[in-house]
Amino acid sequence: MTTTPELLAPAGDEECMIAAVNAGADAVYFGLRDGFNARARAANFATEELPRVFDYLHAHGVRGFVTFNTLVFDSELALAEKTLQAIARAGGDAIIVQDLGVAKLAHEVCPQLALHASTQMTVSSPEGARVAASLGVTRVVVPRELSVEEIARFSAGTDLELECFVHGALCMSWSGQCLTSEALEARSANRGQCAQSCRLPYDLYVDGGRRDLGDVKYLLSPKDLAAYALLPELLKAGICSFKLEGRMKGVEYVTNIVDKYRRALDHALNTNAKGLDANDEQELRLTFSRSFGPGFLKGSDHQTLVHGKYPGHRGLEVGRVERVEQSRGYVYVNAVPDAPALFPGDRVLFDQQRPEENEPRGSLFGVDDLGKGQLKLVFGGEEAGRRGSGADLDRVRVGDVVYKSRDIALARKLKRIAETERKLAIDVQVSGRVGELLQVTARDVLGRSAQTQSALPLAAATSRPLDRALITEKLCAFGESPFELRTLSVDLEGAVAISPSELKRMRRALTDALTEQQTPRAPREVTSARALSRFSVSEAASRPLLIPLLRTIEQVDRAIAMKDELGLVDIELDFMELVGLGVAVERVRAAGLKVIIATPRVQKPGEEGYDRRFRKLAPDGILARHLGAVEHFRHDGEGRLHGDFSLNATNARTALTLLDLGLTTLTPAYDLDATQLLALCEGVPASKLEVTVHQHLPLYHTEHCVYSHTLSKGKDFRTCGRPCEEHLIHLQDTQGLQHPVIVDVGCRNTVFNAKAQSAASVIGKLLNANVRRYRVELVRETTDETAHVLTAYRELIDGHIDARTAVKRASAIEKYGVTSGTLHVVTA
């Protein structure tokens, strides 16, 4: 357990790791090349390097955490176990994990290996933390969507350590709940392959018409988080680890953020330490920023979280282009007040309000201050004979905004910090009296200690006596050694004398003794996990169920009218804003059907009232979409609790873990393809699975409200005027697809895929595997469309039509047709 606040730094490669250590990190986190980490495109580390990596970190008093924060498939569990064993044996301090089954697996393999729940696990409340703790988790990385106040509530309700991101890129979607890359790019963010779809431009459509927003095009691209000023508040709220994002960034960026946040955290812990000033913030902006903000830590502000003008790095604004002399390599700029100074070697960028294109940028050969706020920037030019890394001036236009994007002097300073080896702090105690040997003890931050004594007894001083200043100068001047003095305790009786050369000899004896001591690896018991049973397919005893998941009262009425034709037993209700939910429950119950209510996708501290509202409606079951709901409802009685896709079960260990928590049925995660889904059916009783066979995949699930941002001036639900009650927004992507945006009871937005996805082609194999529950999800389909889709899948399940016919019939009502999705389904 962490006893003092920790600065946790990213390391995408070894150079960044060394830089983070030298810049002052208390711990670093990194991923492995074997996979299982959410930054698959980073250089990462080889598993066989782990002993050397941890030895290096521990020798510098730094902890090392391995990211294991992706979902794992059944075919990968053996490698996952082997990798976890290697991490434990190498001396890893913790793993950061997303997959619930992997957390349980790691705890079986090595109980002494600390488990940290990644933001990808979506542990957003104390109730969810209790589930995580039951699997062996000791720390939760809180979601970026929580405010300081909500974090304080979280902390008050759990004994687990809490870790918080304080700097870096923000995801638009709740971590672990983003399916955009999966749906649109066939690469899963839950597998470390995020396609950065939130950084793309989107057109806004309101009630079917395009709304012109000028240069605001990046509606889902948040500013970067910069919370250095909030560290004191976060400390009071209960945060023990302050996490910096950036495993995909380079060494300059890592050095800069660690150096700055080291000082900011030291200042938060001791106000006598120097904090950050305006120049420090400018330096943070120069290594990377999309503009800075507090994220959600100060609560929701939908007007400032996203500016929408650009998705990438800018830096510091210099001014606007007034004139270009291309052949001479000159660009004349009208500078803004307080424009940053420019020097040869600095890089600038020309913002042309088309960031999706390759914007002109380059390094400066020279800068002339012409006075009255006018600058002449000198680049390469044919006429001037300057060649090299100049900007592409033929694309620079009058009016372009000029940004300073890199500072060469800052780069040199950061290089020195990154390459200056970090020293270990040691505490020294000195004692002695006349006629006795001088005794010296030193202890470093790793707990290693060494003692030495003078060769001869101390004599009475006849000139300068031994004092604190002389001890500091001769005994504690550790110079080129890997140590530096932290505290000095002196206990001398009387005026004693010793030669400076003897003090130097004793210093060398101390440093040699400490250096020779190897940092011991804590003894650990590493075992193999118990094998899982394989489940045989038993003969089906009942007609497979079609389970409609409905979102409007009109859909409910139509489904009830067709209940006998469709063979309905259960209806799942996902009334996202809860409006009309009570009426729908009554109608389903009056029709003699069982009603299952879906919870919101996430629940934050202070939102427990939703669960009480659901319980008051007395449904036949709850469709739990977050771990807090699992904890809240799992003691309500057998048969009442169903787990949804958002619990992210992609392997048998995770599925069985969730079923052991009290779930009656479970919908597998949408990251599985057909082969993986069928493999899951072999490791879990297939009768316990509910498979979604038709849906509009929920791409993003966001705390940010597009309605509030674009259709109001309000910053949150209290001031936005609720435009979501009067309008329907679609976001049109670069392919021309218009994705509907639906608001839930927590004012969170779900962006649904414009295209429907079908699993029709695998239904036959699922039936053979004894899967009995088949869900069809609707979003805003009309009553006729509801009947059309439900009938097609009922007939397919009953064997009256084939998969191709079912898909063709489902496609008939879809504007963009039906896609195969990840299950490789046949299409019409």
Residue ranges of predicted features:
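Short glycine-biased active-site loop of nucleotidyltransferases that positions the nucleotide triphosphate
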Residues: 107
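Conserved phosphotransfer cores of two-component systems
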Residues: 110
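Glycine-rich, highly charged phosphate/nucleotide-binding loops
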Residues: 45-51
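Surface-exposed amphipathic alpha-helical tracts and adjacent flexible/coil segments at the periphery
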Residues: 1-23, 27-40, 53-54, 60-70, ...
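Active-site glycine-rich loop that binds ribose-phosphate moieties when present
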Residues: 123-125, 226-227
